Amino acid sequence: MYFNKMIPELSVTNLENSLKFYQTIGFKIEYERPENKFAFLSLGEIQFMLQEISKDDKWKISPLLYPFGNGINFQLEVENVDKIYSFLKDHNCKIAFEIEENWYRQDEKLLGNKEFLVQDPDGYLLRFSEDLGCK
């Protein structure tokens, strides 16, 4: 298995709930360590690690308050953003920003994305994005 050079590990309050959410939107469990309440997930080239919070968590440097990941969002490039968006809306997931087209300047060209933001069960923001090319 190939591991990306950067793989976010998200602290979650309930691994089972988080796995249901991520699997529902297409993530695959690559491997698990049930004894540690840990799972490694992938969706295409996107990789995440999930670890259920424990009271003796050595990685926790301050109390975790909902929503987790405050101040950050993860951009996940997918091939069909409309399909994921519709599915999440149909399942009453908390959409933070509705789907829209955005064009971002890179030097002299504009790069397009069709994107939206959704919160996972612990409040992490996931920005699903589809490449619209450049102009």
Description of each model-found segment:
Residues 18-22, 88, 123:
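Conserved active-site tyrosine of GNAT-family acetyltransferases
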Residues 14, 80, 120-122:
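Acidic active-site catalytic centers that drive phospho-/nucleotidyl reactions
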Residues 1-7, 28-79, 85-119, 129-135:
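Vicinal oxygen chelate
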Residues 11:
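Catalytic core of Fe(II)/2-oxoglutarate
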Residues 14-28:
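Amphipathic alpha-helical segments
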